[in-house]
């Protein structure tokens, strides 16, 4: 190619580049004008066929034309990149003065909140939090807790038994097995709180649910008495329900404690009234339970107690239907979640 034809090819490339509207078009035009099949690259490849005395000038003409086209391509590319960046910024621009709809933030479930509040109270007393499996051996759920073989709590009407029949595995009916496991694996003294899910064959209604949460406490040490139990429950009740709260005990029977009692709580409720409400069970650990875990009841005594989290939440907050706690309706959970 002559110098004139090379300049014409470079001018055509420059004119084409100027007409590109975006980077994709520019890339396509570069392939057309500076790709392998374009005039200037072809002229460069043919330099070897030109007589030696003309090759130097021909090479200079080719390089000048190619350099001019490449330089202009680079300039146009910079302009189009700036244009693209400006368009992207405009699309992504946020007007911070425009009012927005506040996003709803998730929060903990009220049962979880209450569980953590109770755990914090016990930790503040120097107690430890202990947990255990939900699928439990009958030995830990019943035998070691002094339940007789024919106790009604063992039946299918009260307990979920795990297949196959005869496996002696159940869904735990209380968190007391955690106490047994702890006493077997730890040296006394022991002060533990045992939160967790438990399972019973109750129908779901306003006051019952087949899956619910318990918090149980166990203390085993030298010289513990019912007075220590009463003081612990008084402190827990005042922390949960307020400084005006009172507790009382009524004699009862449980296989794993002796003597045993029901504990009631009195406190001003959210509706402006006050009254005694049954809260949970408690008592001194039965000597048979201590012997079953290798603790000498002549040297050590212990007390234990337990209450339902759902029931506590229900009467503390004036809730009429326990089903609201398990059905997942955000209208129920949102007011509690604000506290989280």
Curated annotation (Swiss-Prot):
Gene3D superfamilies: Bira Bifunctional Protein, Domain 2
Localization per Swiss-Prot or TrEMBL: Cytoplasm
Source organism per UniProt: Corynebacterium glutamicum (strain ATCC 13032 / DSM 20300 / JCM 1318 / BCRC 11384 / CCUG 27702 / LMG 3730 / NBRC 12168 / NCIMB 10025 / NRRL B-2784 / 534)
UniProt GO molecular function: ATP binding; magnesium ion binding; phenylalanine-tRNA ligase activity; tRNA binding
Gene transcribed to yield this protein: pheS
Highest taxon, organism lineage: Bacteria
Protein name: Phenylalanine--tRNA ligase alpha subunit
Group of enzyme by EC: ligase
Organism lineage string: Bacteria, Bacillati, Actinomycetota, Actinomycetes, Mycobacteriales
Amino-acid positions noted as binding Mg(2+) in the UniProt annotation, renumbered to this chain: 258
Family as reported in the entry's similarity comment: Belongs to the class-II aminoacyl-tRNA synthetase family. Phe-tRNA synthetase alpha subunit type 1 subfamily.
Cofactor(s) of this protein: Mg(2+)
Annotated EC: 6.1.1.20
Any one GO cellular component localisation term in the record: cytoplasm
Cofactor: how and how many bound: Binds 2 magnesium ions per tetramer.
Residue pairs linked by disulfide bridges in the UniProt entry: none
